[in-house]
Amino acid sequence: AKKVISVGVYNHYKRIGNQSEPDVEIEKSNMLMIGPTGSGKTYLVKTLAKLLNVPLAITDATSLTEAGYIGDDVESVISKLLQAAGNDVEKAERGIVFIDEIDKIAKKRNTNSRDVSGESVQQGLLKLLEGSNVEVPVGATSKNAMVPLTTVNTQNILFICGGAFPDLDKIIKARLNKQSSMGFQADLKDKYDDDPNLLQK
C-alpha cells in the first residue's frame, strides 16, 4: 500500500510540475484507500503531507451534509485546507484532502425521506474531485456576510478517500459467481475464498 500511494502521489505532483506544454492536458487522478478501521490510512496520508511539506485537510465523510442542513457542507473541506495553508490560496491549490469513512455516504436504499448526507454529498464531492472553482470563506469554515470570500481551484488538489467497505469481498464474490457454469467443469462456489487479489476484480 505504501509503495502504491507513494507512486500515485509522485505522479500527481509530477503532473502539476510538468505544465510547460499548455496544449497537452493530463487529467488529474485521485486515490481510494480500502482498509479496516485502525489500519493506518490516516497516518499514512499525514506522513506523506509532512514529508512533502504541503497543507493537509482531514475530514470525516459522515459529518458532511447538503448545503443548508446542520453539519458541514462539501465546500467546508476546502475551507479547512485553506486554513491549513495559512489562507494562502496558491499553497492550498497544491495541497492534499483526505476524506475518511467515504463508504458511509452510499445512497440509502428503499427510503422515501430526503437523503441529505448521501447522494447529494456524493454529487457535491464529485464536482470537487473532478476540478472546479469553489468560493470559500477566508479565516472561517462557514459563509456569512461578515467574512470575505476567495476562489480556490481544485484542479491540482489531491483528494484521497478512505473507507473500510465492509462486505465488499462478498459483493465481488456474488458478482463473479453469477458467471459460473454448470456441469463437471463448473467453477466451485468457494473458488474465490482464498484469492488475495479479490478486491481488484
Q: What are the functions of these language-model segments?
A:
Residues 1-57, 61-70, 74-201:
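AAA+ P-loop NTPase nucleotide-binding core of proteostasis motors
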